[in-house]
Amino acid sequence: MLNGGHDDPASIRIRAGALTARIEAGALRTIQAGGIEAVRQVYAAVRDHNWSTIPGELTDIDLEQSDDGVRYAYTSTHRSGDVHFVWHGEIIGSSRDNTLTFIFDGEAKSDFRANRVGFCVLHPGDIAGQPCTILHTDGASEEAGFPADIMPHQPFFDVRAITHETANGARVTVTMEGDTFETEDQRNWTDASFKTYCTPLALPYPRMIAAGTRIRQVVTISAVMPPDAPSVTSDDDDDAQVVMTVTGATVPVPRIGLCVNADGAPITLSEAATLRTLRPAHLRLDLHPAAPDAHARYAQAASQARALDSGLLVALHLTDDADAELGRVADWTHEQDPPLDAWLIFKASSPGTPAALVNKARNVLSRFQVPVGSGTNGYFTELNRHRPDASGLDFVAYSVNPQVHAFDNASLVETLQTQGDTVRSAAAFTGKPVVVSPVTLHIRWNPNATSDDPPTPPGQLPRQVDTRQLSQFGAAWTLGSIKHLAEAGASAITYYELTGWLGVMERETGSPLPALFPSEPGQPYPLFDVLRSVNEFAGGTIRVMRSSAPLRAVGLVLERGGSMRIMLANFINDYVDVRIPGFLETTLEPYAVVIADGQSNG
């Protein structure tokens, strides 16, 4: 399976004078001014009371293009649970004045609670540190800048327009009407962008939207080109050869492990034999000592760690009764004598962990002589906003998933470089080794939910499940994640679970819904081979490698004991020509992972 059924949307290339863009699934993407990306995306979102994005179904599509410009119109219908919202979109491009105008005009067809309905504008993350001008709703302007470091909270409030200059001297202004907008640093969630969104978060949410409520917003992108700007002949370079350059910089291969099955499913002898070949450095157990089955789950995880020759990373979720819970855990540890790797201390259901709780845990657990870390069970956002007192920590930790805001293949790939940025940022403000644990393709839990999600209807996959788990795309994405996290200096990374829909292989019993998740009983998924191939170089080094087109293909170079392994990943549903000067030249098939072994000359 190439992409788990997640096909790339049809893409329409449009031009409005010096501005070029693509229309995909009703959104404007890769808006360039004179061939240089100025705005990554403009799209409209309907998000319910739990921040779940309600997808839209597009109908009544109409496209007109000429030398004078473009007009693209459609209707988008969003229905899920209580939510029923319909809006009409219109994208108008004018070649005469280099403008793209996006109109959102919608009506609620039901009463529902929502956290956001309307436009979001994404500026690319690589303009971090660049100056900009903010026009506020009262007409006042402010000279500002996109933050270089990942900013915990919003850099810009009360926004009507943002103007910045691209590398080729184009002055690009994005004007937003119909609501008050503000900007957040989406790198917190590994999105490679700064998002300017409608409806300030300081206002109470969720808000009730009554049937019949109309919402209209307009976003206009305009560009003033320098007099000597060259004419645009192409809006991208999709067919160019990707050149990868091996640098002299090196980092250690991180210790890569897996999570035990969250549903408590055991592993069979045959599954254990297969998993042992992956050589996981650790197994992560999320242990809630107050839960009735905590003792049994601890014993099971200890047994699995021994069976796989792995260490046990115990993530303790402690409540206000932490003294009693730590006492029980200490007793169970003496009883089980597991191959401990480390302790990870969390305050249960909290975005951060108080230093006093970490110190209390260290006092009880230090007798077992393994590292004690903390941070957050949530995203880097929570770590950044609730920065721990790292003086009593051996490492800091946070989790990653690429689908907090967007769900298409291209957006998932865009998160990969930003994953590395979060590691560098966490290391900078804590001064401690960084453990990224776990990395999953989809959300495990929502730290910002205002209520529980409804149960999964019969015959449907749970929200946490993504069919790209068993796809070639999933393998390529996993290699990209390892590359960027490792090259940024992550000391350890936890990926996925052992078996099943969220694991690295299917269970012997097979998929409970084979029509929706078409795996083969007992078979490893393609991402299994990626993890195994990297772990075969455990204790070695990684030579940092740069790609000329990191959203199309990247590579990872591993070395140990005179041996070298080059692993290449193709992120797109097309063939990609790759050249590594002095090493190899090849063509990658769609979503392929290619491995080449040789001798190290370093």
Language model features with spans:
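Aromatic/acidic polysaccharide-binding cleft in carbohydrate-active enzymes
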Residues: 212, 437-526
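Catalytic domains of carbohydrate-active enzymes, especially glycoside hydrolases
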Residues: 259-292, 304-313, 336
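Acidic-aromatic substrate-binding/catalytic surfaces of carbohydrate-active enzymes
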Residues: 1-77, 280, 284, 295
